[in-house]
């Protein structure tokens, strides 16, 4: 078997500006020697994270390694193909080790976020996960996300953390997804077996041919190989997010990332973030019912791109729940209720009726709880 070609085969290219990103780190980097977690490669990645946070950007880490860490604590246990219960036990043992590894690199709090398939399939839990991640970023913490292998069952698993990283990137409206691998980027074939493999430093449009190039190889100790990384790039690209594949074992490559230089593969999105988001908002099913707003609120939404606040609400129709897609209407000379916009509502119909016309600061007093100042946030709203 031949060695991996050096990173210099990939020309250096600039990384466009971004303000929010996800970094995915796999087991092959955190447990490279098969003997549990090691800071060997994680330290360089931590420097990349710190440099960007210091510059005012926001980052979420999606990190594998819990099962590998657990396996090192109680050897020998079945490999990754073993019983589900054994794997879940290993994840429970190793997750604390994984968070401790990341915390040692940072002088800011590291937040553990464990997600399951149901958290992302159920709209309300999806919104709660998004709100939690956004708040953690707002507080200046570093969220470290992993799939909750301790409770996930095979038929409801997200499958791999490449896929999870793409979902999280869309969840937080990221502009970039960085996937650290144990290979330099995408090649025309596996460079570990074919010395004539050619590097692909930029992919404008991912095709079935690219997936075929990646094959079905998987990295040692994990569940995802290059094919799953390309599938994640497809998912991220559908949300307007750039994906960057790079060698996380190369200090030079990782240091270059901190200076917005990539030696690896850039995979372009299939649409812009705005187009992807607005398309989903415009075409998702709408629940029965609507919120009627006054002329001032209508002007703020239509002309200023504002969020919908309770002060501009006149009434709520129907029995919608928090997280539902609802219609926002206003009065016109010809119609008592004219469709203006649609969006994801932060409060139920019953709650909206109670806080209609009030100031946002009074929500807590009127309801006894609050989900924020807005009824429909501008990021969750599209004009018709």
Curated annotation (Swiss-Prot):
PUA domain location: 288-370
GO BP annotation list: L-proline biosynthetic process
EC top class named in words: transferase
Domain of life: Bacteria
Compartments where found: Cytoplasm
InterPro entries: AceGlu_kinase-like_sf, Asp/Glu/Uridylate_kinase, G5K_ProB, Glu/AcGlu_kinase, Glu_5kinase, Glu_5kinase/COase_Synthase, Glutamate_5-kinase_CS, PUA
Binding site for ATP: 24, 181-182, 223-229
Pfam families hit by this protein: AA_kinase, PUA
This protein's name: Glutamate 5-kinase
Organism of derivation: Xylella fastidiosa (strain M12)
Lineage: Bacteria, Pseudomonadati, Pseudomonadota, Gammaproteobacteria, Lysobacterales
GO cellular component: cytosol
UniProt xrefs under Gene3D superfamilies: Acetylglutamate kinase-like (3.40.1160.10), PUA domain (2.30.130.10)
Family, per entry: Belongs to the glutamate 5-kinase family.
